[in-house]
Amino acid sequence: MSILVKGQITITKGFETWKQMVYEQDGKLAEHGIKFLFAGTEKDDPEKLHVVMMFPNMESIQAFQGDEELTEKRRLAGAVIESGVMTPISGDFFTNYPEAFISH
């Protein structure tokens, strides 16, 4: 079963720079099985990025965290890696949009 993760990290080069990095790393993200369900900054603090990501399993989360090449790309895009917090969400949740969780 997939694992949802809520993440928060500080970004210093703006949301557009970070978003462009994500698009450029699409192949690497697919390699880890990562899907972004949401990404956006706080209304009053554009340096605080919040994400909801879906990983296929715990091993893919660990692989993402240990991927030095991807970490460096994130750092170059302004992500302050040391500020990042990733919180796995329990399997006990609901959504009004179940199609986001259907494998295509």
What are these regions (language model features)?
Residues 1-71, 80-104:
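Short S/T/G/P-rich N-terminal loop/turn motif that feeds into the first structured element of a domain
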